[in-house]
């Protein structure tokens, strides 16, 4: 009986950390890898790469825990989230807080093996991860904070490799914020009706009937910034082909969301994993060439 209870609790923690849904971790991982490859340039040191890959998964899990903790009073009123561990009672509030602290502590232990500049930047990463889930109560732009949280690994990666945060770093950071606003608006379009009922704010609500147009403008800006980064770093034509492929994926996403159906919007959101992957492959091949 004790093993059954323990097993159920571990499964609940597993769901709370979203380890069964890796899309969020992947959307956090790709910009991190972009930054490491550009900052090096090429293949980064194995230990630095390992620290950032592990840190991505740990902090994404921590972000999911604090997000569900912040939304625990709302999730029970939304069909898609009603069965999450906190509103369903599978995990207590105290257990969620403890799990968050453990995940953050493990992440910080990894960062302590890097240089001082990276350690100091990690404090801001923690603040962004904690603040983001609460922003949707006060502003229609929580996706901007999400983009900053998901992109803060970019200056950390540059700092870890070169102890500097050059122009390319901040252009990539900006590109990631715009990308995150675009894809998380697609995600928010799935829950727009429910969010309106319970008073949750989002860019999907703010943009209203202009949502598709604004997403398109953001996507074009992302492509322009990534092309500029390629030019500043002297990357080869293979990289620019990857930017074009990413653009084709954005066009496909626009076709998906044209009718604003929930499943299609979610599919468009998920497709962004391929955008991140394609851009990383373009970077990697450019440095190999």
Swiss-Prot record:
<feature type="transmembrane region" description="Helical">
    <location>
        <begin position="23"/>
        <end position="43"/>
    </location>
</feature>
<feature type="transmembrane region" description="Helical">
    <location>
        <begin position="234"/>
        <end position="254"/>
    </location>
</feature>
<protein>
    <recommendedName>
        <fullName>4-hydroxybenzoate octaprenyltransferase</fullName>
        <ecNumber>2.5.1.39</ecNumber>
    </recommendedName>
</protein>
<dbReference type="GO" id="GO:0008412">
    <property type="term" value="F:4-hydroxybenzoate polyprenyltransferase activity"/>
</dbReference>
<keyword id="KW-0460">Magnesium</keyword>
<dbReference type="InterPro" id="IPR030470">
    <property type="entry name" value="UbiA_prenylTrfase_CS"/>
</dbReference>
<dbReference type="GO" id="GO:0006744">
    <property type="term" value="P:ubiquinone biosynthetic process"/>
</dbReference>
<feature type="transmembrane region" description="Helical">
    <location>
        <begin position="163"/>
        <end position="183"/>
    </location>
</feature>
<keyword id="KW-0812">Transmembrane</keyword>
<comment type="function">
    <text>Catalyzes the prenylation of para-hydroxybenzoate (PHB) with an all-trans polyprenyl group. Mediates the second step in the final reaction sequence of ubiquinone-8 (UQ-8) biosynthesis, which is the condensation of the polyisoprenoid side chain with PHB, generating the first membrane-bound Q intermediate 3-octaprenyl-4-hydroxybenzoate.</text>
</comment>
<keyword id="KW-0808">Transferase</keyword>
<comment type="similarity">
    <text>Belongs to the UbiA prenyltransferase family.</text>
</comment>
<keyword id="KW-1133">Transmembrane helix</keyword>
<comment type="pathway">
    <text>Cofactor biosynthesis; ubiquinone biosynthesis.</text>
</comment>
<dbReference type="InterPro" id="IPR044878">
    <property type="entry name" value="UbiA_sf"/>
</dbReference>
<feature type="transmembrane region" description="Helical">
    <location>
        <begin position="213"/>
        <end position="233"/>
    </location>
</feature>
<dbReference type="GO" id="GO:0005886">
    <property type="term" value="C:plasma membrane"/>
</dbReference>
<keyword id="KW-0997">Cell inner membrane</keyword>
<dbReference type="InterPro" id="IPR006370">
    <property type="entry name" value="HB_polyprenyltransferase-like"/>
</dbReference>
<dbReference type="InterPro" id="IPR000537">
    <property type="entry name" value="UbiA_prenyltransferase"/>
</dbReference>
<dbReference type="Pfam" id="PF01040">
    <property type="entry name" value="UbiA"/>
</dbReference>
<keyword id="KW-0472">Membrane</keyword>
<dbReference type="InterPro" id="IPR039653">
    <property type="entry name" value="Prenyltransferase"/>
</dbReference>
<keyword id="KW-1003">Cell membrane</keyword>
<feature type="transmembrane region" description="Helical">
    <location>
        <begin position="46"/>
        <end position="66"/>
    </location>
</feature>
<feature type="transmembrane region" description="Helical">
    <location>
        <begin position="99"/>
        <end position="119"/>
    </location>
</feature>
<keyword id="KW-0831">Ubiquinone biosynthesis</keyword>
<feature type="transmembrane region" description="Helical">
    <location>
        <begin position="141"/>
        <end position="161"/>
    </location>
</feature>
<feature type="transmembrane region" description="Helical">
    <location>
        <begin position="268"/>
        <end position="288"/>
    </location>
</feature>
């Amino acid at each position: 009986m004790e093993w059954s209870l323990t097993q159920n609790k571990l499964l609940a923690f597993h769901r709370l950390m979203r380890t069964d849904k890796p899309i969020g971790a992947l959307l956090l991982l790709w910009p991190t890898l972009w930054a490491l490859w550009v900052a090096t340039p090429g293949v980064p040191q194995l230990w630095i790469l390992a620290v950032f890959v592990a840190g991505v998964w740990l902090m994404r899990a921590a972000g999911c825990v604090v997000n569900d903790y912040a939304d625990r009073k709302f999730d029970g009123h939304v069909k898609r989230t009603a069965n999450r561990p906190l509103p369903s009672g599978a995990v207590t509030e105290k257990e969620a807080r403890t799990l968050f602290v453990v995940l953050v502590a493990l992440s910080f232990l990894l960062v302590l093996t890097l240089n001082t500049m990276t350690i100091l930047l990690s404090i801001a990463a923690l603040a962004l991860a904690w603040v983001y889930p609460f922003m949707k109560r006060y502003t229609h732009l929580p996706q901007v904070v999400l983009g900053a949280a998901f992109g803060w690994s970019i200056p950390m990666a540059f700092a870890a490799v070169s102890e500097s945060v050059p122009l390319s770093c901040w252009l990539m950071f900006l590109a990631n914020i715009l990308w995150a606003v675009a894809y998380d608006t697609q995600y928010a379009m799935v829950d727009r009706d429910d969010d309106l009922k319970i008073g949750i704010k989002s860019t999907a609500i703010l943009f209203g009937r202009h949502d598709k147009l604004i997403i398109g403008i953001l996507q074009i800006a992302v492509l322009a910034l990534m092309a500029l980064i390629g030019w500043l770093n002297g990357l080869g034509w293979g990289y620019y082909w990857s930017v074009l492929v990413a653009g084709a994926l954005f066009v496909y996403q626009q076709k998906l969301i044209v009718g604003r159906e929930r499943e299609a919007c979610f599919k468009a959101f998920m497709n962004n994993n391929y955008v991140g992957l394609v851009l990383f492959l373009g970077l990697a091949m450019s440095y190999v060439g």
